[in-house]
Amino acid sequence: MSRRHAAEKREVLPDAKFGDRVLTKFMNNLMIDGKKSAAEKIVYNAFDRVESKLKRSPLEVFHECLDNIKPSVEVRSRRVGGATYQVPVEVRPERREALAIRWLINASRARNENTMEERLAGELVDAVNSRGSAVKKREDTHKMAEANKAFSHYRW
């Protein structure tokens, strides 16, 4: 741990098209090599695809997807007397959001469609229907926490 003071949280500006801060965080995570305009193009084109498929507001779909992906508990390693236990702990709201965003992006990148916008749109549609790799990741995390419930008294 650093002995200095904690870094200040910077305010994320809302995106230009939808005026949403969470969407900006998503784009920032999607961005590679500082190419924000490329990330924006991918997201907006994916949103257009989602809107044409589901006939719903893409921003609503996006937030519903994140809600379906957000984990409520996770396991953390805790060393007690030479043994390492996987201790289930509740996830803070900021971390929930960050994990959901990260899992959605990783699941999208792992898909087999041709372009990133197709992959992202496909994963968004799957996540809103509670399918897909990102939702599976959350289910696996919850299963791990449930399996290690016996060690929950080691919480810190």
UniProtKB/Swiss-Prot annotation:
Family: Belongs to the universal ribosomal protein uS7 family.
Gene Ontology molecular functions: rRNA binding; structural constituent of ribosome; tRNA binding
Superkingdom of origin organism: Bacteria
Name of this chain's protein: Small ribosomal subunit protein uS7
PROSITE patterns per record: RIBOSOMAL_S7
Keywords (A to Z) from UniProt: Ribonucleoprotein, Ribosomal protein, RNA-binding, rRNA-binding, tRNA-binding
One Gene Ontology biological process: translation
Any Gene Ontology CC annotation: small ribosomal subunit
